């Protein structure tokens, strides 16, 4: 089983094998496109309106392309490691701090992984993300104090690792 932890800060996805994809690329371009739209909307002309639509199309295309690439690499990671299942966080239960844009990106990523994995006979499941970042993937001890930012240190067995990697191991 390949576990995939999804995040809103730092990493888009981290797998239980340690593979990592940054969300900063998407966040950077989202802000750039927001600036371009705002600048064009201030003009109010028909030309500006048409350009706002083109900017939206470029933005959507860029994001879809990146998510396709990440999905392909996640599936390749599963194939290389002999995984018959890819377990991702259940997006219906994902954290309340997600805005609509992140929600869109994660749902699309899940769909892309699902159809690409099908080509390899790999099943994709959604797992409850509750406490995955607080549960030790080594001994199973769950405590809020186990995680501090990006660091994970189990208060019971002393296991230490990156918090997102630990969470990905718990998802899978």
Predicted regions and their residues:
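Positively charged, helix-rich recognition surfaces that bind polyanionic ligands
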Residues: 1-172
